[in-house]
From Swiss-Prot:
One of its GO terms (cellular component) is host cell endosome membrane. This is Envelope glycoprotein B. The gene is gB. The record marks 460-461 as: Cleavage. The keyword Cell membrane does not apply. Residues 41-62 have a biased composition (Low complexity). It is found in: Virion membrane; Host cell membrane; Host endosome membrane; Host Golgi apparatus membrane. It comes from Human cytomegalovirus (strain Towne). Pfam families: Glycoprot_B_PH1, Glycoprot_B_PH2, Glycoprotein_B, HCMVantigenic_N.
């Protein structure tokens, strides 16, 4: 059964092959006799392909076929053909009878000049104003009284100056008015301390009188001082007495004060700092700062002050508004003025008569070659009616007019009105546009002829959102950023002009290249037009124009490239390009052609040449290439392995865009101020605050003078000159006592003095202890202490008998002592009268006392003589007596006096 099935399959295949061969032979009749048998001469060269061909390759073998199998509808075998590559262009037939679209090459190409960036450039005049950082300067009057107290001590011929004390006090307001109207000051000053009025008089005159002000010898450019006393007075006191005198000097100083924006305080050249705005008038606290004590601040309208304090009977001047600030050490006065009349936030910096304003996307660039700087500003103008511009508006307009009259009046006209812009660095630019008269006339003619443009250029609107107010930002102190911006804009202009020239030259080169394409298209129009449009195009000349048509796309899977390029019926002849077979779409009829460039199929196979041996030909198809050696296919190679001739000059240029340089601050103004160890403003303010605190402390100080001394002083002063002299004497004694007590107290406070006192106290305690022990010993042993010669060195009592025997005897016992001589037995003592001692009479007692006195005198004289004799012979007997070391060594066993040689002989 299975054998029958296989037989049927084989028969069917044979029938199909025979039928296909019959159809093929009938369809190729009359076309070419060589088409039916030239493939029999093809070689069976090995089919090789480069491993690097990774692009899409379409082969006719959609299924696995044997090398000897015949291709459908042909007499060729699969081993006689090579696969194809359709990577870049598909296989197509571009031969046509007539084009459907007509084109021509441009002959009159015009290369216009390139404008790098669409910039609106205006020419004009620029006046630049900077922020005024100079402090506001004005005159200030300072009123003071200087009390100088000097103390001296008068010796017999010399007076010693012990020191001086200077105190600055503020005159009362009633005296200030007298000084301002008469240039005179009173010679006294009174102060209330703890409810008591203290009065100081000039030169201790005890009378209050006026003193005329006069110019001081010391003056400078910013301060003028008027005083009542130039020399300090002091008088010598009485001999051996102290003297303290008072010198009172009135001082009026006209100095300079400075205040910077926003004028919250001002500082004088004398070092005083006032936390009040110099423009505060009592009603404008919202606009002007006030930080002092309101009770000590006074404002007087239409106030009169002498024109010269140093000249008597000087003329009076009326001041509109004068402020007075009363302090503990001075009274400060100044004239109150309107801020807008005496200050200005802006000051003139520079003018540029030739300025170019370029308009960027969000900003204006004002470039001046004279200043070598470019300033950036927003497109919004500053309102011309801004109050901050009131002080410079007229000046700026006049400067612009002067520059225009000097440089442009003959050839230029003003173009628009004056505009104001604020730069990124805080500068203010007044801008006046100008334009040549000839251009203005042309614009006027164009405006008259145009129905839509019937008006000239007018001033930009400064209302609404187009205008802004001047900000309060501070000007930068370094304008390097403006010079950097100018450098960048200059380089940008040069580079953009160079790029414009390059672009224009590129256009000229493209025009010439187009002429070359035109001439080359006469040779192969389809190839030239396909290269230009980057797609397959069929082109043919129709006179002076080109007819274009789309190429006919064929069945890509049916394309086969033959391996052999030899012509069978013509020995020695070879095809100049490989032969291919293909089918049109929706047709199974096999067509023959030759492989053209870029996968184009050339109809027919008549393109032959004489065979040249040896030969090497490579035909490109997509990203691969067919290599034929001696007109036989050898292999497919990767197209990337073959170097290319690159004649393309790439040109990728972009114009430089606008860049607005920002003002960068590495450290802010606050950080720079904080980096300093000393801040003069803060120091002066702190010092001023410290001085203000002193006046509050003075009210709480209690007079340390005792009430009784004050009463005594009043009592002595009431007794006249004699009482005053007695009071001076008492004061001197009291001062001496107070000085001694103060010295003792100071000595005790000293660590060395306290230590000395401790040592003295210890010594006193030791002395008291020694005295106490002596008195105790005297009470216990009166005879031994009062009559030391009665006791020998060994502790025995010396009697009037034989001292040689008794000195060596032991002392008698207590029972055998003389105190018990009346006792006869061991029993208790008897009270018998016979044992009692006989009474002594007064005469006997008196004689006994005299005998004791004589005995004491003799014994003492004898002892003194013995001591002197021992001193003379001490050097001879020094070695026999114990020294200090022996005494210390045997101090525990006691010490007995050793007898010398004289005593031994006597024994």
């Amino acid at each position: 059964m299975e054998s029958r099935i296989w037989c049927l399959v084989v028969c069917v295949n044979l029938c199909i092959v025979c039928l296909g061969a019959a159809v093929s032979s009938s369809s190729t009749r009359g076309t070419s006799a060589t088409h039916s048998h030239h493939s029999s001469h093809t070689t069976s060269a090995a089919h090789s392909r480069s491993g690097s061909v990774s692009q899409r390759v379409t082969s006719s073998q959609t299924v696995s076929h044997g090398v000897n199998e015949t291709i459908y509808n042909t007499t060729l075998k699969y081993g006689d053909v090579v696969g194809v590559n359709t990577t870049k262009y598909p296989y197509r037939v571009c031969s046509m009878a007539q084009g459907t679209d007509l084109i021509r090459f441009e002959r009159n190409i015009v290369c216009t000049s390139m404008k790098p960036i669409n910039e609106d450039l205006d020419e004009g005049i620029m006046v630049v104003y900077k922020r005024n950082i100079v402090a506001h300067t004005f005159k200030v009057r300072v009123y003071q009284k200087v009390l100088t107290f000097r103390r001296s001590y008068a010796y017999i011929h010399t007076t010693y100056l012990l020191g001086s004390n200077t105190e600055y006090v503020a005159p009362p307001m009633w005296e200030i008015h007298h000084i301002n109207s008469h240039s005179q000051c009173y010679s006294s000053y009174s102060r209330v301390i703890a409810g008591t009025v203290f009065v100081a008089y000039h030169r201790d005159s005890y009378e209050n009188k006026t003193m005329q002000l006069m110019p001081d010898d010391y003056s400078n450019t910013h301060s003028t001082r008027y005083v009542t006393v130039k020399d300090q007075w002091h008088s010598r006191g009485s001999t051996w007495l102290y003297r303290e005198t008072c010198n009172l000097n009135c001082m009026v100083t006209i100095t300079t004060a400075r205040s910077k924006y926003p004028y919250h305080f001002f500082a004088t050249s004398t070092g005083d700092v006032v936390d009040i705005s110099p423009f505060y008038n009592g009603t404008n606290r919202n606009a002007s700062y006030f930080g002092e004590n309101a009770d000590k601040f006074f404002i007087f309208p239409n106030y009169t002050i002498v024109s010269d304090f140093g000249r008597p009977n000087s003329a009076l001047e009326t001041h509109r508004l004068v402020a007075f600030l009363e302090r503990a050490d001075s009274v400060i006065s100044w004239d109150i003025q309107d801020e807008k009349n005496v200050t200005c936030q802006l000051t003139f910096w520079e003018a540029s008569e030739r300025t170019i304003r370029s308009e960027a996307e969000d900003s204006y660039h004002f470039s001046s070659a004279k200043m070598t700087a470019t300033f950036l500003s927003k497109k919004q103008e500053v309102n011309m009616s801004d109050s901050a511009l009131d002080c410079v508006r007229d000046e700026a307009i006049n400067k612009l007019q002067q520059i225009f009259n000097t440089s442009y009046n003959q050839t230029y006209e003003k173009y628009g009105n004056v505009s104001v812009f604020e730069t990124t660095g805080g500068l203010v630019v007044f801008w006046q546009g100008i334009k040549q008269k000839s251009l203005v006339e042309l614009e006027r003619l164009a405006n008259r002829s145009s129905l839509n443009l019937t008006h000239n250029r007018t001033k930009r609107s400064t209302d609404g959102n187009n205008a802004t107010h001047l900000s309060n930002m501070e000007s930068v102190h370094n304008l390097v950023y403006a010079q950097l911006q100018f450098t960048y804009d200059t380089l940008r202009g040069y580079i953009n002009r160079a790029l414009a020239q390059i672009a224009e030259a590129w256009c000229v080169d493209q025009r010439r290249t187009l002429e070359v394409f035109k001439e080359l298209s006469k040779i192969n129009p389809s190839a030239i037009l396909s290269a230009i449009y980057n797609k397959p195009i069929a082109a043919r000349f129709m006179g002076d124009v080109l007819g274009l048509a789309s190429c006919v796309t064929i069945n890509q899977t049916s394309v086969k490239v033959l391996r052999d390029m030899n012509v069978k019926e013509s020995p020695g002849r070879c095809y100049s390009r490989p032969v291919v077979i293909f089918n049109f779409a929706n047709s199974s009829y096999v067509q023959y052609g030759q492989l053209g460039e870029d996968n184009e199929i050339l109809l027919g196979n008549h393109r032959t040449e004489e065979c040249q041996l040896p030969s090497l030909k490579i035909f490109i198809a997509g990203n691969s290439a067919y290599e034929y050696v001696d007109y036989l296919f050898k292999r497919m190679i990767d197209l990337s392995s073959i170097s290319t001739v690159d004649s393309m000059i790439a040109l990728d240029i972009d114009p430089l865009e606008n860049t607005d340089f920002r003002v960068l601050e590495l450290y802010s103004q606050k950080e720079l101020r904080s980096s300093n160890v000393f801040d003069l403003e803060e120091i002066m303010r702190e010092f001023n605050s410290y001085k203000q605190r002193v006046k509050y402390v003075e009210d709480k100080v209690v007079d340390p003078l005792p009430p009784y001394l004050k009463g005594l002083d009043d009592l002595m002063s009431g007794l006249g000159a004699a009482g005053k002299a007695v009071g001076v004497a008492i004061g001197a004694v009291g001062g001496a006592v107070a000085s001694v007590v103060e010295g003792v107290a100071t000595f005790l406070k000293n660590p060395f003095g306290a230590f000395t006192i401790i040592l003295v106290a210890i010594a006193v305690v030791i002395i008291i202890y020694l005295i106490y022990t002596r008195q105790r010993r005297l009470c216990m042993q009166p005879l031994q202490n009062l009559f030391p010669y009665l006791v020998s060195a060994d502790g025995t009592t010396v009697t009037s008998g034989n001292t040689k025997d008794t000195s060596l005897q032991a002392p008698p016992s207590y029972e055998e002592s003389v105190y018990n001589s009346g006792r006869k037995g061991p029993g208790p003592p008897s009270s018998d009268a016979s044992t009692a001692a006989p009474p002594y009479t007064n005469e006997q007692a008196y004689q006994m006392l005299l005998a004791l006195v004589r005995l004491d005198a003799e014994q003492r004289a004898q002892q003194n003589g013995t001591d002197s004799l021992d001193g003379q012979t001490g050097t001879q007997d020094k070695g026999q007596k114990p020294n200090l070391l022996d005494r210390l060594r045997h101090r525990k066993n006691g010490y007995r006096h050793l007898k010398d040689s004289d005593e031994e002989e006597n024994v």
